[in-house]
């Protein structure tokens, strides 16, 4: 009965996404109900992965015409090179290609030089086109070449200097993470008549290259992949039959009606009101779904779990080809086996 370790835990049925003012950048993600303590466990793990492990794009180096190092200045440009480099760190990119690319920027004064002045390449999009890089005086010209790449986390400038870097190439500290801020809160919530559950609320802000909803999904997938190595057993079989005897792909006991399970009147009425007719209908329900049934409480849940356990079944199982089209005929056909 090892499956009880995970199959009988309450799980959130779905995520609730509450978009912020800019839905592509800000959202609140709500998951409930969770077993007590799981809000903190999952919230902390997701936050750390969101901030550290998602792939994004950034400018990794710049080469400006007639500039030998970052402590130089460019005639007619109000900012010195150090300030230009700092402003380049604020350019937000989206790259749909894996290989590093080079972009160019050419501008003439007077006026502001913005991220939108960067000439985009195939598969690369500048997201914050109004971001100011520098200001040019009358008659001033600025020409630069930018190296952009995909990566994760933070990479210091010295790591972005190629071994064969030409004179004048200035490496830049790269912040690849598309996630800017993550906070979470765990509060009590109820499920049916039970109050002792967690509600996880996460506020996620990205740079726009990735939606908050996708960011959370990718972080969860990373955690899932990392934990898979710790699972040292095969999943127990679902409610199917490998020999497919009598032409069925599932246990014929699932065709038995729930009103034959000798449940209490209260439990039986709750199942009836929820249109649960056969055992096959019942075992596909999760605990969370059952507790949302009107007038269905923990006592009824425990009663049903005990009855199913005696049959080698449990809530939350998958059933192949259920319900069959001719379910009533099949139920009559196998009635003598019950």
Swiss-Prot record:
Pfam families: RNA_pol_A_bac (PF01000), RNA_pol_A_CTD (PF03118), RNA_pol_L (PF01193). SMART domains: RPOLD. One of its GO terms (molecular function) is protein dimerization activity. Residues 1-234 are annotated as: Alpha N-terminal domain (alpha-NTD). Homodimer. The RNAP catalytic core consists of 2 alpha, 1 beta, 1 beta' and 1 omega subunit. When a sigma factor is associated with the core the holoenzyme is formed, which can initiate transcription. This is DNA-directed RNA polymerase subunit alpha. The keyword Transcription applies. Belongs to the RNA polymerase alpha chain family. Keywords: DNA-directed RNA polymerase, Nucleotidyltransferase, Transcription, Transferase. It catalyses: RNA(n) + a ribonucleoside 5'-triphosphate = RNA(n+1) + diphosphate. NCBIfam families: PRK05182.1-2, PRK05182.2-5, rpoA. DNA-dependent RNA polymerase catalyzes the transcription of DNA into RNA using the four ribonucleoside triphosphates as substrates.
């Amino acid at each position: 009965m090892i499956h009880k370790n995970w199959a009988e835990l309450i799980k959130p049925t779905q995520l609730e996404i509450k978009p912020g003012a800019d839905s592509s950048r800000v959202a609140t993600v709500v998951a409930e109900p969770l077993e007590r303590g799981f809000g903190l466990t999952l919230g902390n793990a997701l936050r750390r992965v969101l901030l550290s492990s998602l792939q994004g794009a950034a400018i990794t180096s710049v080469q400006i015409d007639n500039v030998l190092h970052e402590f130089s200045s460019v005639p007619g440009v109000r900012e010195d090179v150090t300030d230009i480099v700092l402003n380049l760190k604020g350019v937000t990119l989206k790259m749909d290609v894996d290989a590093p690319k080079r972009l160019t920027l050419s501008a003439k004064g007077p006026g502001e030089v913005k991220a939108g002045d960067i000439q985009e390449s195939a598969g690369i999009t500048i997201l914050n086109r109004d971001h100011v890089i520098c200001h040019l005086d009358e008659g001033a010209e600025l020409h630069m070449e930018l190296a952009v790449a995909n990566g994760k986390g933070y990479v210091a400038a010295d790591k972005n200097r190629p071994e064969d870097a030409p004179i004048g190439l200035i490496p830049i500290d790269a912040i690849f993470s598309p996630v800017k801020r993550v906070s979470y809160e765990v509060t009590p919530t109820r499920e049916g008549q039970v109050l002792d559950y967690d509600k996880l609320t996460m506020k996620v802000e990205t740079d726009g290259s990735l939606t908050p909803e996708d960011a959370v999904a990718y972080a969860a997938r990373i955690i899932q992949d990392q934990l898979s190595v710790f699972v040292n057993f095969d999943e127990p079989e679902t409610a199917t039959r490998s020999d497919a005897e009598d032409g069925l792909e599932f246990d014929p006991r699932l065709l038995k009606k729930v009103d034959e399970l000798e449940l209490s009147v209260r439990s039986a009425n709750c199942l009836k009101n929820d249109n649960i007719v056969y055992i096959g209908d019942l075992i596909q329900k999760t605990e969370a779904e059952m507790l949302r049934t009107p007038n269905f409480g923990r006592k009824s849940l425990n009663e049903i779990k005990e009855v199913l356990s005696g049959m080698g079944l449990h809530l939350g199982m998958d059933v192949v080809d259920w319900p069959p089209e001719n379910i009533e005929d099949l139920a009559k056909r196998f009635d003598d086996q019950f």
